[in-house]
Amino acid sequence: MAETERLMPNGGSRETKPLITGHLILGTIVACLGSIQYGYHIAELNAPQEFLSCSRFEAPDENISYDDTWVGQHGLKQCIALTDSQYGAITSIFSIGGLFGSYYAGNWANRYGRKYVSMGASAMCMVSSLLLFFSNSYLQLLFGRFLVGMSCGTAIVITPLFINEIAPVEWRGAMGSMNQVSINLGILLTQTLALKYADSYNWRWLLFSGSVIAVANILAWLKVDESPRWLVSHGFVSEAETALFKLRPGTYQQAKQEIQDWQRSHGHNRDPESSEETHSGPTLWQYVTDPSYKKPRTVILAILSCQQFCGINSIIFYGVKVIGKILPDYSIQVNFAISILNVVVTLAASAIIDHVGRRPLLLASTTVMTAMSLLISVGLTLSVSFLLVTATFVYIAAFAIGLGPIPFLIIGELSYPQDAATAQSFGTVCNWLATFIVGYLFPIGHGLMGGYVFAIFAAIAAMFATYVYKRVPETKGKTTYSEVWAGY
């Protein structure tokens, strides 16, 4: 592939920021409901672990028998006896399902459109949430978590892709970071509901709530148009012009001109009868094996994998259990506070990401995470609760300002527009593999090494900071592939 000068997604003037329209806000919010589902389900097993697995009994009302509750009356067990390894498998198989969903999501999105693939993912999320709610065995929980992982794996590809395609370049960083904000909102929602439902009678309602979010997302998509970039790439030019006109503050003629600029930048002017395969981008296998994709592929692999290998999901998956060893009476409350902090700092990052840039935030984020991982290790090893909680809060804040929002945002910015869906799938698959490895191995490593396991995360974060400094280009405000990769 010749690295010719082509416009990146939403290329345009960088002089002033255009106004944000109501349809742009609506489209971003609806797309982000998919990320909220991802965040919700990735953390839903954190708080109720001991109650679900029969390790702890806590009745919300001593005067009411479990058999008198709705779930008890309908034959649902009070708990499902699980070993730590079985619970680890249920937690981590979410990542395997997510890997499958992400693997196919790019091709599905290219073929059927961003909107309808996202709606299908939400439908699967609704069904799998209900399956988890009604589960009475280890195998049922495994199957439900695999399915919900598939749906979330699809959603986490579509959300940043759709936002990147509808946002003006001047707002790309701020709006793209809403993906991570939404993931954190999903995690916060789980922790909020856990304050009420994390007990021996009500833990199933935490699993049921995911279906409510899924139904809301399906209905909300009915109010949003398909991505204009997908429409124009498949020959639906008039529909693309109408959709873009709603997203932009200017006139219909200006929207039409932007569509024509897109077509010229890609060297085609398609009609509806054209083969949709011609400009659908590479397959995932082509992307992985073709040497012409080596530069963006390598950086995407490093960023999306190290986001997990720096240890964030050791807190998201197992934070209640880890902190509970030192603060058993306050572990759920501490995790709730962590979730609030994650949302607040990510929102703050979204306000500065287009001013500061991607590289400085990634460097600051990983450097602080390195130091805090070491302090978490010390706090756990020496049972110093104040040090553990403080270091954990700073660690989460550091993640939220850089390594949280930037990886999924930067994939599209590092890629040609026609490669973006496949690159998004590739990066997300890498992220899922890393998530599975951390989710499965962390409880084993923590059992063998105790707090010293966080020293491993510190070493990885330090190496990744060095890699960012040497290999990751800045993408802030850049509109062409060659401009992004100049000097690399």
Curated annotation (Swiss-Prot):
NCBIfam families registered for this protein in UniProt: SP
Glycosylation sites: 63
Keywords: Glycoprotein, Membrane, Repeat, Transmembrane, Transmembrane helix, Transport, Vacuole
Cytoplasmic side: 1-18, 109-121, 168-178, 226-299, 338-344, 412-419, 464-488
GO terms, biological process: monosaccharide transmembrane transport; transmembrane transport
UniProt cross-references to InterPro entries, sorted A to Z: GLUT, MFS_dom, MFS_sugar_transport-like, MFS_trans_sf, Sugar/inositol_transpt, Sugar_transporter_CS
Superkingdom, natural source: Eukaryota
Pfam family, one: Sugar_tr
PROSITE patterns the UniProt entry points to: MFS (PS50850), SUGAR_TRANSPORT_1 (PS00216), SUGAR_TRANSPORT_2 (PS00217)
Residues spanning the signal sequence: none
Location relative to the cell: Vacuole membrane
GO molecular function: hexose transmembrane transporter activity; transmembrane transporter activity
UniProt biased composition (Basic and acidic residues): 258-279
Transmembrane segments: 19-39, 88-108, 122-142, 147-167, 179-198, 205-225, 300-320, 323-337, 345-364, 391-411, 420-442, 447-463
Disordered: region residues: 258-281
Protein name: Probable metabolite transport protein YBR241C
